[in-house]
Amino acid sequence: MDSPLAIIVLAAGKGTRMKSDLHKVLHPIAGRPMLMHLMASAAELSPARQVVVAGHGREQLEKALGGSADIAVQDPQLGTAHAVQQAQGALSGFEGDVLILYGDVPFVRASTMRAMIERLHGADEPAAVVLGFAPADTLQYGRVIADDGRIVKMVEHKDASEAERACRVCNSGLMAVRSADLFGLLARVGNDNAQGEYYLPDVVNIAIADGRTCAVVVTDDADEVAGINSRGELAEAEGRWQQRRRAAAMADGASLIAPETVWFAWDTVLGRDVTIEPNVFFGPGVTVGDNVTIHAFSHLEGASLAQGVEVGPYARLRPGARLEEKVKVGNFVEVKNAVLHKGAKANHLTYLGDADVGAGANIGAGTITCNYDGYFKHRTVIGERAFIGSNSALIAPVRIGADAIVAAGSAVSRDVADGELRMVRAEQLVKPGWADRFHDAMKKKKAEKKS
C-alpha cells in the first residue's frame, strides 16, 4: 500500500445502555480501553492521519488519546454518514485512502484492515470497500447483496425481500474509501428515513447508482466485528478475549492448571515453562520470565518476575515490584515499588513497600517496612544475606547491613551495620507464681458473685 492512509474512528454515541459516566469506548477490556485496542491495531498500518469523531464525553477522549489523534466533534448526532462528514476539516489537504472504523468495535484485526485497503486498490478500482461478516443470527443486520465480491446493493433488514434476507453476508459498518471520493459521496446522502438520519451505507448505493464498482471483503471471524453497547456485551467481549489469550499462552509453553480462572491483561508477557495455578489475576504491566510458578489466588500488576521465581499462594505484587532470579514471595505477602534481588525470600505475611532487599536475604513472617510518614514515602534497604526475624517493623528510612540479624519482634528505626545483631524489645518482666495467684483470686471473686 503506497497510498497514504487516514483512519476515522466514530465514537460520538452516548452509550446510554452502559449507564456510566465513563465514555463507552473507554471501558476497559483486559485492562485497556476498548478504543485503544482498536487504535493499536490500526497503528500497524502506519496511518498518516487519525481522527476520532466525538460527541458526548469529548474531554475524556482527548485525555485518553493524549494527542495521538485529532478530535472532530459531531453535535448533534445525525447518523453515521453525518459523523464521518465531521472529520472533513481534520483531513483537509489529505490525499489517500480513508478507513472508517467504530470505537465500540475494538477487535478488528490489522490484517482485516489491510485486506480492505488492498481490495480498494484492486484492478476494478472500487469506489468503496465494505467489511462483511456472517453471524450465527442475521436477524438484526443489514445485508450486503453481492455478486462475486462486487456489491449489487446494501439493504437494511427491515427493507429486505425474502430472497435478500437469505443472504448471510451482513454489513459490519466498516468501510474503506478514497479521500477523493468520500466527502463528495457523503454530501449526497439524504435523511429520508424513519429516523431522519444520514446513514453511511448509502454511500455505497450512491456510488453504484453512478455506475461505480463497490466491493465487499468478508471476515472469517464474526467476533472481530462484534459491537459493544452494554455491560453484558462488554463482559462477553472480555470473555472472548481472555479465552483466546489463555489458548495463546498455553500454545506458547505456559501451563494453566484451570485456564478459565486465569485473567490476563492486554500486555502480559509470559516466558516458557511458566506454571499458573487457579484464580490468578494479571493487571497491566506484568512480565514473567521462564520457569516461574505463580500459585493460586495471586494478584499481579506492574511487576516483573525473573527466571525461577515462585509467587503465592495469595500473594500481591503491585506496581514497581521487581523479583530477580529464584526469589520467593509466599502467602499473604505484598510487594510494592520494591526490588528483591536473587534468592531473597519473604515467605509469609509480609509487606515490602519502597524497599531494596539484597540477594539471599530472608524476611520473616509478619515483617513490615513502615514506608509512609503521612506525607512522604521513605525507602528501606536490606543488605545481602540479612535475616529479619518475624514480627519486625523496619521504620524507613533505614538500612540493614549485609549479614545482619534483626531479632524477632524488633522495631528498627536506626541503621544496622553489616554483621550486627539488632534487638529492639522491651525488657521481659518475670514474676514467678503471679499467674497462679491471679487465677485463684479471680475464681474466688467469681464464686462470691454467685453466692
From Swiss-Prot:
The active site is at residue 348. Pathway: Nucleotide-sugar biosynthesis; UDP-N-acetyl-alpha-D-glucosamine biosynthesis; N-acetyl-alpha-D-glucosamine 1-phosphate from alpha-D-glucosamine 6-phosphate (route II): step 2/2; Nucleotide-sugar biosynthesis; UDP-N-acetyl-alpha-D-glucosamine biosynthesis; UDP-N-acetyl-alpha-D-glucosamine from N-acetyl-alpha-D-glucosamine 1-phosphate: step 1/1; Bacterial outer membrane biogenesis; LPS lipid A biosynthesis. GO terms for biological process: cell morphogenesis; cell wall organization; lipid A biosynthetic process; peptidoglycan biosynthetic process; regulation of cell shape; UDP-N-acetylglucosamine biosynthetic process. It comes from the Bacteria. Its EC number is 2.7.7.23, 2.3.1.157. It catalyses: alpha-D-glucosamine 1-phosphate + acetyl-CoA = N-acetyl-alpha-D-glucosamine 1-phosphate + CoA + H(+); N-acetyl-alpha-D-glucosamine 1-phosphate + UTP + H(+) = UDP-N-acetyl-alpha-D-glucosamine + diphosphate. Acetyl-CoA binds at residues 365, 371-372, 390, 408, 425. Its main location: cytoplasm. Binds 1 Mg(2+) ion per subunit. GO terms for molecular function: glucosamine-1-phosphate N-acetyltransferase activity; magnesium ion binding; UDP-N-acetylglucosamine diphosphorylase activity. UDP-N-acetyl-alpha-D-glucosamine binds at residues 10-13, 24, 74, 79-80, 102-104, 142, 156, 171, 229, 318, 336, 351, 362. PROSITE patterns: HEXAPEP_TRANSFERASES (PS00101). Residues 253-451 are annotated as: N-acetyltransferase. The keyword Iron does not apply. Residues 1-231 are annotated as: Pyrophosphorylase. Residues 232-252 are annotated as: Linker. GO terms for cellular component: cytoplasm; membrane. Keywords: Acyltransferase, Cell shape, Cell wall biogenesis/degradation, Cytoplasm, Magnesium, Metal-binding, Multifunctional enzyme, Nucleotidyltransferase, Peptidoglycan synthesis, Repeat, Transferase. The keyword Cell wall biogenesis/degradation applies. Its cofactor is Mg(2+). Mg(2+) binds at residues 104, 229. It is found in: Cytoplasm. In the N-terminal section; belongs to the N-acetylglucosamine-1-phosphate uridyltransferase family. In the C-terminal section; belongs to the transferase hexapeptide repeat family. Homotrimer. Catalyzes the last two sequential reactions in the de novo biosynthetic pathway for UDP-N-acetylglucosamine (UDP-GlcNAc). The C-terminal domain catalyzes the transfer of acetyl group from acetyl coenzyme A to glucosamine-1-phosphate (GlcN-1-P) to produce N-acetylglucosamine-1-phosphate (GlcNAc-1-P), which is converted into UDP-GlcNAc by the transfer of uridine 5-monophosphate (from uridine 5-triphosphate), a reaction catalyzed by the N-terminal domain. This is Bifunctional protein GlmU. It comes from Novosphingobium aromaticivorans (strain ATCC 700278 / DSM 12444 / CCUG 56034 / CIP 105152 / NBRC 16084 / F199).
